[in-house]
């Protein structure tokens, strides 16, 4: 494996993700066709030098330096591959807003892993990158679909190995994601949850998850509607999202099969048929507007390819 030359550059596209999807807390996530683009370049300097350039309206909220997730992920690749760290510049075209429940942090982790691995000739397998991504993030539901694409169920087996199952998502099932101009940190959303839950609530979630997965596989809206309910995390998190319940109700009244908090929130996911999408989008935006919150609600498809990289040639 050769050290990347000064100026060597790769471009990494990484999709947004929506995690949990109701009952699949910390194990179910899907990639959406909304990408962050990371252009990673070897620059002059030692391995502790890292420069971050953000293109996008919300870049001021992101940190550079040693705490940056792109940098931390790249460092993990150098170490796992037995390579000396190199100085990096990361230019980010930000389309996935941070602290909205759309896996922005996961895009940074995956980009750092994939980009750093590409710069040294891809010595690490995708399975190893997956392991590193989960270790950095602390839970799998965003980083796994961000890396692999599609709808992914991830669980830790009795052997302590992470096992990933790619689940089917019928192409007729569309996602409206209402993204408000308010932020909610994952740590705050996790603090709102209890340490334990009643056994009955866990049983209800298991049944709901089964219905949801079958509904997504077949495109059966009734099954999606019956399955897209949660008792483990959403009852404690809706109160953190200003106008969240109103937005949810507006989506259902406009024809959504089901509605859930996207990840830790505050974005809200509605699943629907394509013909209902525009009306649901408008209804969700209006509902947030009624409580003084600006938002947008794009109609998105499942992104099935996950992250990918390509070399960049200045010529």
From Swiss-Prot:
Coiled coil: none annotated. SUPFAM superfamilies: GHMP Kinase, C-terminal domain (SSF55060), Ribosomal protein S5 domain 2-like (SSF54211). The keyword Glycoprotein does not apply. It comes from the Bacteria. It comes from Synechococcus sp. (strain WH7803). Keywords: Amino-acid biosynthesis, ATP-binding, Cytoplasm, Kinase, Nucleotide-binding, Threonine biosynthesis, Transferase. The gene is thrB. Signal peptide: none annotated. One of its GO terms (biological process) is threonine biosynthetic process. This is Homoserine kinase. It is found in: Cytoplasm. ATP binds at residues 97-107. PANTHER family: HOMOSERINE KINASE, HOMOSERINE/4-DIPHOSPHOCYTIDYL-2-C-METHYL-D-ERYTHRITOL KINASE. One of its GO terms (molecular function) is ATP binding. Its EC number is 2.7.1.39. It is an enzyme of class 2 (transferase). One of its GO terms (cellular component) is cytoplasm. Pfam families: GHMP_kinases_C (PF08544), GHMP_kinases_N (PF00288). It catalyses: L-homoserine + ATP = O-phospho-L-homoserine + ADP + H(+). Pathway: Amino-acid biosynthesis; L-threonine biosynthesis; L-threonine from L-aspartate: step 4/5.
């Amino acid at each position: 494996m050769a050290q990347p030359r000064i100026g060597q550059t790769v471009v990494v596209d990484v999709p947004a993700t929506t995690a949990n999807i109701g009952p699949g807390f910390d194990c179910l996530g899907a990639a959406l066709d909304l990408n962050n683009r990371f252009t990673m370049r070897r620059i002059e300097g030692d391995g502790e030098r890292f420069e971050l350039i953000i293109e996008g309206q919300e870049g001021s909220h992101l940190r550079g330096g040693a705490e940056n997730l792109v940098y931390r992920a790249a460092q993990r690749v150098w170490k796992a591959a037995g390579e000396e760290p190199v100085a990096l510049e990361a230019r980010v075209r930000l389309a996935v807003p941070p602290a909205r429940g759309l896996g922005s942090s996961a895009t940074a982790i995956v980009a750092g892993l994939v980009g750093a691995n590409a710069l040294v000739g891809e010595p690490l397998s995708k399975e190893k990158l997956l392991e590193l991504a989960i270790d950095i993030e602390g839970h799998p539901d965003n980083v796994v679909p961000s890396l692999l694409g599609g709808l992914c169920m991830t669980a830790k087996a009795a052997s302590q190995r992470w096992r990933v199952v790619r689940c089917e998502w019928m192409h007729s099932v569309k996602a409206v994601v209402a993204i408000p101009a308010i932020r909610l940190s994952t740590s705050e959303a996790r603090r709102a949850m209890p340490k334990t839950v009643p056994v009955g609530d866990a049983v209800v979630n298991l049944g709901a998850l089964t219905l949801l997965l079958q509904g997504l596989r077949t495109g059966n809206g009734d099954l999606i509607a019956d399955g897209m309910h949660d008792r483990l995390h959403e009852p404690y998190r809706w109160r953190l999202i200003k106008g969240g319940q109103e937005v949810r109700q507006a989506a259902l009244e406009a024809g959504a099969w089901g509605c859930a908090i996207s990840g830790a929130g505050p974005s809200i996911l509605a699943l629907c048929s394509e013909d209902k999408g525009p009306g649901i989008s408008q209804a969700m935006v209006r509902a947030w507007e009624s409580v003084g919150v600006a938002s947008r609600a794009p109609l998105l498809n499942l992104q099935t390819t996950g992250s990918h990289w390509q070399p960049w040639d200045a010529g």
